[in-house]
Amino acid sequence: MLSQWFRGRHLVVRSALFSRRRVSSESTSTKDDVIVDFEDPDLPLPEYPKRPDEPLETRKQRLMYQSRKRGMLENDLLLSTFAHKYLKDFNAEQTALYDDLINGVSNDWDIYYWATGVKQTPKEYDTEIMKLLKLHVDNAERVTRFRQPELTYYLKC
């Protein structure tokens, strides 16, 4: 028998084996939970406005800010370190692809799952920028990323 709880948009399913133990009301999540994410068709999400006349340097500065302020720590760390490392060297086309990636997706968890390989990346987002982000996430250099990089580095370049 399965017991189910709704938490926001996520459905957490726990087997009967784990539901027998006493769980406090504050902390009901365990590593054995299965999270099922589902789309809510009744929730209209506005499309991010395109900015075709925005100068490249202004766009890069906006993207640097948006990479740091995602609303979830996982993407804050991944995208801020990625932007810190690569954004200053992107050309206009690559910058537009990065803009589409971080602003075109309605759910930041999708970006996280695609970058970490948990979910398959849809064709429209499987670009050279996503491939570069996946390499960044693989972290072959074994760089520690416990905090976001300083903003002063980008401003000097």
From Swiss-Prot:
Q: Where is the transit peptide?
A: 1-22
Q: What is its main location?
A: mitochondrion
GO biological process entries: copper ion homeostasis; mitochondrial electron transport, succinate to ubiquinone; mitochondrial respiratory chain complex II assembly; protein-FAD linkage; tricarboxylic acid cycle
**HAMAP family in the record:** SDHAF2
- Which keywords accompany this UniProt record? Chaperone, Mitochondrion, Transit peptide
Note the superkingdom of the native organism. Answer: Eukaryota
Name recorded for this polypeptide? Succinate dehydrogenase assembly factor 2-B, mitochondrial
Q: Which residues form the signal peptide?
A: none
Q: Which Gene3D superfamilies match?
A: Flavinator of succinate dehydrogenase
Role = Plays an essential role in the assembly of succinate dehydrogenase (SDH), an enzyme complex (also referred to as respiratory complex II) that is a component of both the tricarboxylic acid (TCA) cycle and the mitochondrial electron transport chain, and which couples the oxidation of succinate to fumarate with the reduction of ubiquinone (coenzyme Q) to ubiquinol. Required for flavinylation (covalent attachment of FAD) of the flavoprotein subunit of the SDH catalytic dimer.
Q: Where in the cell is it found?
A: Mitochondrion matrix
Keyword presence, Signal: no
> What is the source species?
Drosophila mojavensis (Fruit fly)
The record's GO CC annotations read: mitochondrial matrix; mitochondrion
What is annotated about its quaternary structure and interactions? Answer: Interacts with the flavoprotein subunit within the SDH catalytic dimer.
InterPro entries the record matches: SDH, SDH_sf, SDHAF2
What family is this? Belongs to the SDHAF2 family.
